[in-house]
Amino acid sequence: MSSAAAATRFIKCVTVGDGAVGKTCMLICYTCNKFPTDYIPTVFDNFSANVSVDGSVVNLGLWDTAGQEDYSRLRPLSYRGADVFILSFSLISRASYENVQKKWMPELRRFAPGVPVVLVGTKLDLREDRAYLADHPASSIITTEQGEELRKLIGAVAYIECSSKTQRNIKAVFDTAIKVVLQPPRHKDVTRKKLQSSSNRPVRRYFCGSACFA
């Protein structure tokens, strides 16, 4: 598979969420299969990947946005034309969890009403790391049950927990986002189980643009 020109459809997927929750790490792990060791705050960036789904190829445009307040006026410019949002929070940060409902959903509803949202809890490895939690007493873990409750509260189509460091469920995050666009849920209250079952079909990736070639 050579280029985006071979794709039969373009899907714009935008990642949003508080700064430092791991949005960029998640994108880099998905496109490059590696975990970045240095933290560099994102302003705006994008990646492109040709993805083979059920025998047809779609061009997946991945848009990374900055969560800092300094970019609140510019960030919505990235929302135009979005097909799906990946809304992320850290599983060891209650503030980022609470901001999903207080900050991010109101912003998405204002600038991109009706666009489906996949809710993602990041840094799963740290939530399970007792040594890390002992060294960082200010951390406040979010349970899977709390994540599911938030998904229902905001009307997200799916909830997935992942770790960029271990790459656990990273592929599932983007597979689910793709399937949500290609196979929209018939009912708003679709279960995560149904989406994950659909996401189990083979998905192949061919990276281009500013993404790493894997």
Curated annotation (Swiss-Prot):
Effect of residue 19 to V: Constitutively active
PROSITE patterns: RHO
GO BP term, example: regulation of cell shape
Post-translational modification remark: May be palmitoylated.
Record's keyword terms, sorted: Apoptosis, Cytoplasm, GTP-binding, Lipoprotein, Membrane, Nucleotide-binding, Palmitate, Plant defense
Entry keyword annotation includes NADP: no
GO cellular component: cell projection; cytoplasmic vesicle; cytoskeleton; plasma membrane
Membrane topology, from the record: Peripheral membrane protein
Family to which this protein belongs: Belongs to the small GTPase superfamily. Rho family.
UniProt protein name: Rac-like GTP-binding protein 1
Gene that encodes it: RAC1
